[in-house]
Amino acid sequence: MTKKDVRILAFESSCDETSTAVIKNGREIESLIVATQIKSHQRFGGVVPEVASRHHIEVITQITKEALDKANATWDDIDAIAVTYGPGLVGALLIGVSAAKAASMATGIPLIGVDHIMGHIMAAQLKDEIEYPALALQVSGGHTEIVLMKDPIHFEIVGDTRDDAAGEAYDKIGRVLGVNYPAGKTIDEWAHKGKDTFHFPRAMMEDDDYDFSFSGLKSAFINTCHHADQIHEELDKYDLAASFQASVVDVLSHKTIRAIKEYKPKTFILGGGVAANHGLRDRLAEEIEKLPADIKPKVILPDLKLCGDNAAMIGAAAYNLYQAGKFSDVNLNADPSLELPYADSMLK
């Protein structure tokens, strides 16, 4: 390893994945370990915070060693320790933060706290170089946001969900359809086999802002299914999935394209767990391709394995903070309600 190389050991434990990674120079994954808990939560239909925290405690020491071993690294090779400190489940976050702080204090290696949403967006940096200014559509179980990035560390929200996040809506309608948690992948697969025959609402699509709302769509879907149950009518699950997904994708793509036209970013990024949705990926790529050459941004769609929660994205984001000298200290604590700053236009 030459002096110009920077290696960061990263921790991620904001929800139901315990992950560690070693990232070199913010772009290269030397190791990535993800201990998933999905099977433990499936029978509950969603994440149980106490169960998640216990699983994090059980594996975090082991996967820290695995990440270092897989990267052929020792603590002497690590330049910084990064950790997600919010947003997320407070108990889950505390496990990662405590482990990272303990490692930092024991080794003297600098600590960097990372916003989980910034991490999701910076997963793109692990695939290709981001040219700034950039615009991201961040879509996950807890967040649906359009984020403007002036540079690698200054982010601001220009559009947000007013109620349910898109990923949350997927999981809730998945329960109605009897799909195991997490439901997103199955709904996406079913949608490709069906047609948009139910024409569910496209909330706020024509509003002159970049905000979203999915509670009305969720209610319309549930009411349609309940009404069919009452009159003993059997609905086609593939058409239901296709109709639901068409509504979500229409709204997300429409508002994203409008934001691209207004802000004229050099790069567009899709981030978050729902970034693995093939319907959304295909539509955005298709709509951006139609834009005039002078405003058509470079498009970075993260690798599917990096759409979910993982420590590699946290290491990528931490590298940018490292270069800017943005370090944390031993007072770093979990912040389950952490938010990126809102653009001035959102505060009026």
From Swiss-Prot:
Q: Which reaction is recorded as catalysed by this protein?
A: L-threonylcarbamoyladenylate + adenosine(37) in tRNA = N(6)-L-threonylcarbamoyladenosine(37) in tRNA + AMP + H(+)
Task: Give the residues the record marks as binding substrate.
Answer: Q138, V139, S140, G141, G142, D171, G184, D188, N277
EC number(s) of the enzyme?
2.3.1.234
Cofactor: binding details: Binds 1 Fe(2+) ion per subunit.
Q: Per its Swiss-Prot or TrEMBL entry, what cofactor is needed?
A: Fe(2+)
Per the record, the major location class is cytoplasm
The protein depicted here goes by the name tRNA N6-adenosine threonylcarbamoyltransferase
Family note: Belongs to the KAE1 / TsaD family.
Q: Which InterPro entries match?
A: ATPase_NBD, Gcp-like_dom, KAE1/TsaD, TsaD
The gene for this chain is tsaD
Please tell me the species this chain comes from: Lactobacillus johnsonii (strain CNCM I-12250 / La1 / NCC 533)
* Residues where Fe cation binds: H116, H120, D309
List GO molecular-function terms, semicolon-separated: iron ion binding; N(6)-L-threonylcarbamoyladenine synthase activity
The lineage's top-level taxon is Bacteria
Identify one Pfam family in the record: TsaD
Q: Which GO terms fall under biological process for this protein?
A: tRNA threonylcarbamoyladenosine modification
Q: What does this protein do?
A: Required for the formation of a threonylcarbamoyl group on adenosine at position 37 (t(6)A37) in tRNAs that read codons beginning with adenine. Is involved in the transfer of the threonylcarbamoyl moiety of threonylcarbamoyl-AMP (TC-AMP) to the N6 group of A37, together with TsaE and TsaB. TsaD likely plays a direct catalytic role in this reaction.
Checking Gene3D superfamilies in the record gives: 3.30.420.40
Identify the GO cellular component terms for this protein.
cytoplasm
UniProt keyword list: Acyltransferase, Cytoplasm, Iron, Metal-binding, Transferase, tRNA processing
- Where does this protein reside within or beyond the cell? Cytoplasm
